[in-house]
Amino acid sequence: MIRTDWTMAEAWAIHALPFADLMHRAQTLHRAHFDPNAIETASLLSIKTGGCPEDCGYCSQSAHHDTGVKATKLMGTEEVLAAARRAKASGAQRFCMGAAWRSPKDRDMDKLCDMVRGVAELGLETCMTLGMLSPEQVARLKAAGLDFYNHNIDTSPEYYAQIASTRTMENRLDTVEQVRKGGIKVCCGGILGMGEAEEDRIAMLVTLATLPAHPDSVPVNLWNEIEGVPVQARAQAVDPFALVRIVALARILMPASVVRLSAGRTGMSDELQALCFLAGANSIFVGDQLLTTGNPAAWKDQDLLSRLGMHIAPAQARPRVAAE
């Protein structure tokens, strides 16, 4: 049963279960909704890097922080499509395009829509993350064929003011709702390791699990150490078992959502990734680069999945159970 009325008390109780019991509950729900041996793959491209006016304290692309990231202009459509072809050849099923903006300018919408149409014509699912959107922009992207829109809430409502001041949690949730109402699938998750308390991680998932509809995809990111950003001063490494518990809780609270291991996999052992898959994670980014951070080499992912007896879900098919 899909619920959107979870409470913090319920989530805390689940999170605190003995590890074996938590894993059993998560894996049971995972098998009810997905093929447990199938992994969804996506590739991520920064189509406009740096110079972002937002002050998100974790981000290397903010114009407020001296991180060495140079601002670029929006890529040309053909350059983006060439990258999409390479992503498809490397095994990606979805192509995500990210731009470091507060929100896209109307003058860029024609080019963005051309990118969406071009990537879709290659047989890839399309995803964008461009910041906040107006209802009119949502409608244009939907008409162009955009499948997914990523807009993370990053952390709990209570901790959010500690990491950003130029936009609020309400701004983020409003964008998520605009996207959902506009008929585009929602990709929305958060980041661990920014100095937040365990309670904040749980509250972040409860926030997502009590939306009118659960996100279609829930990315779980580990913060990558970045010189020159405010979060660096209070960032703390995430205990491996704490990560697995959050993945399991995400699977239990949102059983039909794809849970993606996103940024931070370069610092995860094969064993930790395997535990995350067992806990319900069923999507990864492929390719050597995310937006501005590294990602495991393709051969490492292929080797890991092979050793685990897992496989990439067929193109254009989410890793659902056969009955669905």
UniProtKB/Swiss-Prot annotation:
Signal peptide: none annotated. Catalyzes the conversion of dethiobiotin (DTB) to biotin by the insertion of a sulfur atom into dethiobiotin via a radical-based mechanism. This is Biotin synthase 1. One of its GO terms (biological process) is biotin biosynthetic process. One of its GO terms (molecular function) is iron ion binding. Its EC number is 2.8.1.6. Residues 37-256 form the Radical SAM core domain. Belongs to the radical SAM superfamily. Biotin synthase family. Homodimer. Binds 1 [4Fe-4S] cluster. The cluster is coordinated with 3 cysteines and an exchangeable S-adenosyl-L-methionine. Binds 1 [2Fe-2S] cluster. The cluster is coordinated with 3 cysteines and 1 arginine. Keywords: 2Fe-2S, 4Fe-4S, Biotin biosynthesis, Iron, Iron-sulfur, Metal-binding, S-adenosyl-L-methionine, Transferase. Its cofactor is [4Fe-4S] cluster; [2Fe-2S] cluster. The keyword Aminoacyl-tRNA synthetase does not apply. CDD domains: Radical_SAM. It catalyses: (4R,5S)-dethiobiotin + (sulfur carrier)-SH + 2 reduced [2Fe-2S]-[ferredoxin] + 2 S-adenosyl-L-methionine = (sulfur carrier)-H + biotin + 2 5'-deoxyadenosine + 2 L-methionine + 2 oxidized [2Fe-2S]-[ferredoxin].
